[in-house]
């Protein structure tokens, strides 16, 4: 009788699973690509700088800038090499962190990122994707450029989170309980985007939830299933990315959100996403959003502490042809501004911060 019951359980299990493959334990990649002393020190320092900006102890602007997603490590390294001197040039006014996104949430289906499908050919070599991602993060941080990423699941952070100086929870997952729990345990600052419908309450609720301790299921560095107990993350904040009803980067919208933040007892300031619904999904409009935000900052507003920008070597986007990108340094997901505009944008942001200092010092 007992044997019959076991057979019934097995017969009804995994009925829609095609196959299950083994994944490398995190420790295998952490040992293969360990963080150098230089990289570890950079991450620690950048996290500290981000903390100070978020908590109003540093008047510089936190700038998350880089490709919508990474599909070509070579182009990502070139981007990092170009960004490094600008990070140094504007260090007194901007804390620049490179956007290094390996995972893409999809509204329906599509390429889910370098970790999920590193060869862009639907082979889903996730072990290779994890290797490539960690090696790239190691290389970028060793260059002296800190990295930022989006977190989509409870396991991948064990492979890459030690290289992340800042993290994001996207608009589609901000309301998710498990992502709030994850954010509560991440060692870096985490931004929650407002909902795709433009609502900000879910993001504010998420911040409150992530500040608290949680227990959730994940894996250890050795790949064993585990119960994770977190301390809570005091470095969470909101990202305004616009919504179905339009942008929310203008001064009036920012003031409304800041009023809600202040009611919750937190510092009333926000990060602005220049892309997505704020640019009406027209990549060149990121420059218009930048100009508006710079005007707010230069006028003395302290309600904006950070910005996000989708930027690449070559402007626009491209579709894959036979599983290959035809244009080097151009996005295969959301369209991005090109390098020339990126340089202009960073200078404008720096000038705005300098102007704000003059206004507020009088």
PLM regions: where:
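Conserved phosphate/anionic-ligand binding catalytic regions in large, soluble enzymes, centered on
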Residues: 62-75, 334
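Acidic (Asp/Glu)-rich catalytic clusters
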Residues: 54-57, 87-91, 135-144, 230, ...
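N- or domain-start disorder-to-order transition segments that initiate the globular core
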Residues: 14-54
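Active-site-facing alpha/beta catalytic cores
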Residues: 2, 7-13, 80, 93-249, ...
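Internal helix-turn-beta structural module
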Residues: 312-357
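A contiguous, surface-oriented mixed alpha/beta subdomain in the mid-to-C-terminal portion of proteins
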Residues: 241-243, 248, 256-271
């Amino acid at each position: 009788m007992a044997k019959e019951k076991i057979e019934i359980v097995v017969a009804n299990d995994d009925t829609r699973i095609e196959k299950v493959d083994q994944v490398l334990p995190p420790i295998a990649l952490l040992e293969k690509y360990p963080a150098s002393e230089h990289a570890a020190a950079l991450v620690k320092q950048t996290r500290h700088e981000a903390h100070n900006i978020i908590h109003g102890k540093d008047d510089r602007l936190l700038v998350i800038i880089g490709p919508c997603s990474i599909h070509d490590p070579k182009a990502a390294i070139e981007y990092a090499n170009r960004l490094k001197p600008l990070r140094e040039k504007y260090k007194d006014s901007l804390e620049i962190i490179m956007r290094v996104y390996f995972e893409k949430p999809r509204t329906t289906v599509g390429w889910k990122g370098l970790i999920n499908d590193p060869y862009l050919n639907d082979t889903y070599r996730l072990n290779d994707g994890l290797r490539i991602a960690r090696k790239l993060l190691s290389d970028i941080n060793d260059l002296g450029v800190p990295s930022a990423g989006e977190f989509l699941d409870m396991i991948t952070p064990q492979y890459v989170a030690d290289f992340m100086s800042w993290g994001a929870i996207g608009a589609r997952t901000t309301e998710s309980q498990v992502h709030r729990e994850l954010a509560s345990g991440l060692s870096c600052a985490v931004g929650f985007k407002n909902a795709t419908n433009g609502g900000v309450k879910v993001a504010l609720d998420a911040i409150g939830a992530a500040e608290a301790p949680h227990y959730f299921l994940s894996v250890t560095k050795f790949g064993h299933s585990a119960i994770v107990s977190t301390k809570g993350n005091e470095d969470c904040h909101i990202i305004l990315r616009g919504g179905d009803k339009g942008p929310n980067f203008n001064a009036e919208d920012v003031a409304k959100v800041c009023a809600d933040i202040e009611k919750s007892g937190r510092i009333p300031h926000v990060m602005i996403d220049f892309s997505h619904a704020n640019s009406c999904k027209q990549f060149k409009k990121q420059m218009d959003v930048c100009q508006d935000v710079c005007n707010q900052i230069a006028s003395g507003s302290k309600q904006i502490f950070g910005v996000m920008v989708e930027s690449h070597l070559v402007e626009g986007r491209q579709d894959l042809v036979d599983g290959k990108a035809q244009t080097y340094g151009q996005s295969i997901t959301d369209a991005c501004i090109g390098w020339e505009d990126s340089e202009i944008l960073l200078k404008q942001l720096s000038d705005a911060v300098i102007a704000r200092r003059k206004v507020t010092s009088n």
